[in-house]
């Protein structure tokens, strides 16, 4: 039994806290909102993020970051990517011994183009024992119902990945694989949110399953293209952190990114969509970061490019789809072979 801290009491952080509790661990669930912590400790609920879910007594809410981190060796990082640096900078001041960070947030930082594991290493290198990334098709709403879910973990230190595999593995409903391709696991988890936004727009426009299937398939090629340019193994994108996460995020009503895209396709403005969501839509920031990174590396990402124009340049969603359909002729097999030939 471990004492494990989860930083971030949103839907995913809370769901993983429940998995850890089911596995016999004592869990400290940290939030910067005191009223949310009181609800967790007094009502045993987190209604804003996971309505109707009762939390076991071994999950204790904390709003004091120092107290939440005191004496633990495993920390699950589940805050939105835009808050990661700030939280880690605060955490660094509270640590007294090295920790293993399990990064479960999915995104790429605009401007720096860094993945979450890189931000972690940059901010707390002196206190970092290991960094492990957990990713895969895993909506929190289904995890808390204990529906079968399968994810992958990766790390520069595969012994650390195997340790975290053991910590999270639940033989009833939460299966964990290891994957040595850290870059691929992170890139797949981050970029699938871009394609989910596009799939939501397509559904909002009423284009049906054919269009969405094409977006998912060609979107996977874009993800692999950028991932391989960053050093990923293309086979990762055929696995849980690639096509697995992509399918669930593009097709499920639980997907925030799909829902946001759906509203955009129906004609709503981005600011209004984000306000109505009330939760972070990681794909918006990731679209900006991936667009910048693709330009820097000379990687062609046409879906990402037109989505960027919709989100940040005000392009009409229907015109964006029309521009994708009007692109020049391509040979699909050559495109796929080029992705694999880079390895």
UniProtKB/Swiss-Prot annotation:
It is found in: Cytoplasm. The keyword DNA repair does not apply. It holds the Pfam family NAD_Gly3P_dh_N. It catalyses: sn-glycerol 3-phosphate + NAD(+) = dihydroxyacetone phosphate + NADH + H(+); sn-glycerol 3-phosphate + NADP(+) = dihydroxyacetone phosphate + NADPH + H(+). It comes from the Bacteria. Its EC number is 1.1.1.94. GO terms for cellular component: cytosol. Its main location: cytoplasm. One of its GO terms (molecular function) is glycerol-3-phosphate dehydrogenase [NAD(P)+] activity. One of its GO terms (biological process) is glycerol-3-phosphate catabolic process. Keywords: Cytoplasm, Lipid biosynthesis, Lipid metabolism, NAD, NADP, Nucleotide-binding, Oxidoreductase, Phospholipid biosynthesis, Phospholipid metabolism. Pathway: Membrane lipid metabolism; glycerophospholipid metabolism. Gene3D superfamilies: N-(1-d-carboxylethyl)-l-norvaline Dehydrogenase, domain 2 (1.10.1040.10), NAD(P)-binding Rossmann-like Domain (3.40.50.720). InterPro entries: 6-PGluconate_DH-like_C_sf, 6PGD_dom2, G3P_DH_NAD-dep, G3P_DH_NAD-dep_C, G3P_DH_NAD-dep_N, NAD(P)-bd_dom_sf. The active site is at residue 192. Sn-glycerol 3-phosphate binds at residues 106, 136, 138, 192, 245, 255-257. NADPH binds at residues 11-12, 32-33, 106, 140, 256, 280, 282. Belongs to the NAD-dependent glycerol-3-phosphate dehydrogenase family. HAMAP family: NAD_Glyc3P_dehydrog (MF_00394). Catalyzes the reduction of the glycolytic intermediate dihydroxyacetone phosphate (DHAP) to sn-glycerol 3-phosphate (G3P), the key precursor for phospholipid synthesis. This is Glycerol-3-phosphate dehydrogenase [NAD(P)+]. It comes from Geobacillus thermodenitrificans (strain NG80-2).
């Amino acid at each position: 039994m471990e004492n494990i801290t989860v930083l971030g009491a949103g839907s995913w952080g809370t769901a993983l806290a429940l998995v850890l509790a089911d596995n016999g661990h004592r869990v400290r669930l940290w939030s910067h909102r005191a009223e949310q912590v009181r609800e967790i400790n007094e009502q045993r609920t987190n209604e804003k993020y996971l309505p109707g879910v009762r939390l076991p007594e071994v999950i204790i809410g904390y709003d004091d970051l120092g107290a939440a981190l005191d004496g633990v060796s495993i920390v699950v990082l589940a805050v939105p990517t835009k808050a990661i640096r700030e939280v880690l900078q605060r955490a660094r001041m509270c640590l007294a011994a090295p920790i293993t960070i399990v990064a479960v947030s999915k995104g790429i930082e605009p401007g720096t183009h860094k993945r979450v594991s890189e931000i972690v290493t940059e901010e707390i290198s002196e206190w970092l024992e290991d960094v492990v990334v957990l990713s895969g098709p895993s909506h929190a709403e289904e995890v808390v119902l204990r529906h079968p879910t399968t994810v992958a973990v990766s790390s520069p230190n595969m012994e650390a990945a195997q340790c975290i595999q053991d910590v999270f593995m639940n033989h009833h409903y939460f299966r964990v694989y290891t994957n040595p391709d850290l870059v691929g696991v992170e890139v797949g988890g981050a970029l699938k949110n871009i394609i989910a936004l596009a799939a939501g727009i397509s559904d909002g426009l009423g284009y049906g399953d054919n269009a969405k299937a094409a977006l998912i398939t060609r979107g996977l090629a874009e993800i692999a293209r950028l991932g391989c340019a960053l050093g990923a193994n293309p086979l990762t994108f055929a696995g849980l952190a690639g096509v697995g996460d992509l399918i669930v995020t593009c097709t499920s009503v639980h997907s925030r990114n799909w829902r946001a895209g759906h509203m955009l396709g129906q004609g709503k403005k981005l600011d209004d969509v984000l306000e109505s969501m009330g939760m972070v839509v990681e794909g918006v920031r990731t679209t900006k970061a991936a667009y910048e990174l693709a330009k820097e590396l000379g990687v062609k990402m046409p879906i990402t490019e037109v989505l960027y124009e919709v989100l940040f340049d005000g392009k009409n969603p229907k015109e964006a789809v029309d521009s994708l359909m009007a692109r020049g002729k391509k040979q699909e097999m050559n495109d796929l072979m080029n992705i694999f030939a880079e390895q």
